[in-house]
């Protein structure tokens, strides 16, 4: 992988800890872009539409009427394991609440009612000499961990993969708008 393509690659693998029926995940990304450009892109509905294209999207709605807050409601089709199909069916509903707390912190609350799961994530931004460092700390809580491993599988297939994909899409999107500016 060239340095150009690795601009937003994780610096270490995600850390999984199972504690009190919650999974704690930590990841770090580097970006060639400034914190200001990253935050502006993450507030932009067009970016979120672009990131939604990569998922099996059925429906998406936005609400950005509150200052420094973006609510996104989505429905996606997800590959549901046979063991969980009695409890869960498609489409899966995802409700995201992005709160832009400051120039160095975004809080994201993601609820997935179909599988009684919620994700609380914090994105911390730091300026570096050649861009930015983004630390993502997430806590995944589910009421159905005991009934099925589906919630863990969902997190493994959706949340971890979505973070990596979203940062790649963010990098590409910023490059494309930079060219058109």
Region locations from a protein language model:
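Intrinsic-disorder/low-complexity, polar/charged segments enriched in Ser/Thr/Lys/Arg/Asp/Glu/Gln
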Residues: 22-28, 69-71, 93-95, 105, ...
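Hydrophobic/aromatic beta-strand elements that line small-molecule binding cavities or substrate pockets
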Residues: 27-29, 58-62, 93-100, 110, ...
């Amino acid at each position: 992988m060239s340095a150009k393509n690795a601009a937003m690659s994780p610096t270490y693998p995600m850390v999984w800890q199972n504690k009190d029926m919650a999974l704690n995940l930590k990841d770090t990304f580097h970006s060639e872009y400034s914190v200001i450009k990253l935050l502006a892109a993450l507030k932009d509905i067009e970016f979120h539409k672009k990131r939604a294209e990569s998922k099996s999207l059925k429906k998406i709605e936005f609400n950005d009427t509150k200052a420094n807050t973006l609510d996104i409601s989505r429905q996606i089709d997800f590959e549901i394991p046979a063991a969980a199909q009695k409890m869960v069916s498609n489409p899966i509903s995802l409700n995201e609440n992005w709160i832009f707390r400051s120039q160095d912190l975004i809080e994201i609350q993601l609820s997935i009612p179909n599988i009684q799961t919620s994700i609380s994530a914090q994105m911390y931004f730091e300026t570096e000499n050649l861009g930015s460092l983004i630390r993502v700390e997430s806590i995944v809580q589910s009421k159905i961990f005991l009934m099925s491993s589906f919630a863990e599988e969902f997190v493994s297939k959706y949340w971890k993969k979505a973070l990596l994909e979203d940062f790649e899409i963010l990098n590409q999107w910023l490059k494309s708008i930079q060219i058109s500016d």
